[in-house]
A protein has these predicted regions:
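Short loop/helix-cap segments at secondary-structure boundaries that form the rim of catalytic
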Residues: 36-44
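N-terminal Rossmann-fold cofactor-binding loop
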Residues: 30-35, 55
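SDR active-site strand-loop-helix element
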Residues: 6, 30, 76-80, 122-128
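N-terminal Rossmann NAD(P)H-binding glycine-rich loop of SDR-like oxidoreductase domains
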Residues: 3-25
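Short glycine-/acidic-enriched loop or helix-start segments at secondary-structure transitions
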Residues: 15-16, 39, 87-88, 132-135
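Soluble, non-transmembrane catalytic domains of enzymes that act on hydrophobic metabolites at membranes
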Residues: 11, 19, 52, 62, ...
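Conserved Rossmann-fold NAD(P)-dependent oxidoreductase catalytic core, especially the SDR/UDP-sugar
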Residues: 94, 106-148
Length: 151
């Protein structure tokens, strides 16, 4: 499968990229900066194409390499999002956390809707923090959102 992967340089992506390559998938990796976490061998794989751009910027979804990669993809995996635990949660950083997730997701959806043959699947991941915290409760996708910033 040809997969467009966005935001795959974090915790999940660092495990998912090698797994997908071992299982015969061709990956187009989109990131704001060259992945320092991937090995040179991984980045030089014939089954990886690398695009350096900001997927949260709407203009990147209108023409060029990113829209071409989306058009060629069978599926999209979106793991994009500014890291949550690396900085203090100032009001400006909280806005970055929201924008890095919502703007990217909206850009993907809008671009997919404009394609004649959009990718067959979109996997969009966020964080369990959306549901809040509890020491005695299990959360599912049907659970209500928490009453805090992440919810």
């Amino acid at each position: 499968m040809r997969l467009l992967m966005i935001g795959c340089t974090g915790f999940i992506g660092n495990e998912l990229v090698p797994y997908l390559l071992r299982n015969g998938h061709h990956l187009t990796i989109v990131s704001r900066s060259k992945a320092r976490t991937f090995t040179k061998e991984l980045l030089s794989s014939k089954d990886i194409t690398y695009l350096e751009c900001n997927p949260a910027e709407e203009s990147n979804w209108s023409k060029g390499a990113l829209i071409d990669a989306l058009d060629a993809a069978d599926g999209v995996i979106n793991l994009a999002g500014e890291p949550i635990a690396e900085r203090r949660w100032t009001s400006s950083h909280c806005q970055e956390l929201v924008n890095s997730r919502l703007k990217t997701t909206r850009g993907i959806i809008k671009a997919m809707n404009q394609l004649k043959r959009p990718p067959r699947v979109l996997i969009n991941a966020s964080a369990i923090g959306f549901y809040g915290t509890s020491s005695d409760k299990n959360f599912t996708e049907e659970s209500e959102c928490g009453e805090h910033f992440l919810g």
